[in-house]
Amino acid sequence: METRERDLERLIPMHKSGASPRDVVLSVPPSPLASPIHVAGKEAIYKVIRSWASKKFMTGCVILLPIAVTFYFTWWFIHFVDGFFSPIYTHLGINMFGLGFVTSITFIFMVGVFMSSWLGASVLSIGEWFIKKMPLVSYIYSASKQISGAISPDQSSGAFKEVAIIRHPHMGEYAFGFITSTVILRGRAGGEELCCVYVPTNHLYLGDIFLISSKDIIRPNLSVREGIEIVISGGMSIPHMLTTLDSETIHRMLESFGILEFGDVCLSLVLAWT
């Protein structure tokens, strides 16, 4: 052992601080050629792990987000509807979650059954007559009724009669809309049938008014419910291919709504808002 120490003293000079030859040998820095490769390997492994973890995390968010949103709004809706009748049951000493919700759903169903009868329609007509006599309430009720009529199961009375595609806001760009009604424009040349086309945002209300010829209106093979789905989903539920309706199909659809009485040119009232 002493012989090895003497050999090290001859090969390596002693440090001024009095460090032993063994400490001097151990304190020699590593080779500069191996360090960058080692660091680059660590960085590459770190980037791969980070990319993999990021992709898996985003995949989990994409899967769980619609589920969480659905459960949240469903839970909120149940609590909201349950709040109508639950105070009555609480006052009676009955504390059971969901009982108010079941009662509310049953009440809505019974109202639908009653209003479908002749007696219910008569009562509704009398109630609407009183509401229309009120200055401010009549406007709110009329607007709300038109919006609710868009999703009415009775398509003959629905506000949205068929889906339309128009060139808006520039040539080469198209927007979805709904034909809501028809009007007649009378002039010196005679009467022209004009179509009201409503182009909503995903909120389905408010907008600007544009006048567009019916020749620029494209009628796709989509139902009103499918059109509403496309608008609400931001275009994500749109089919990969759209086909336009032929003239005979359009003629039959217009006849079913009773709006074929005048000419071929339509005025499109396009309601859109930014």
UniProtKB/Swiss-Prot annotation:
Extracellular compartment segments: 82-93
InterPro entries documented for this protein: COV1-like
Disulfide bridge partners, by residue number: none
Membrane topology: Multi-pass membrane protein
Similarity section: Belongs to the plant COV1 protein family.
Record flagged with keyword Transmembrane helix: yes
All ranges on the Cytoplasmic side of the membrane: 1-60, 115-274
Keyword terms, alphabetized: Membrane, Transmembrane, Transmembrane helix
A matching Pfam family: DUF502
Subcellular location: Membrane
Protein name: Protein LIKE COV 3
Transmembrane region(s): 61-81, 94-114
Signal peptide: none
GO cellular component terms, semicolon-separated: membrane
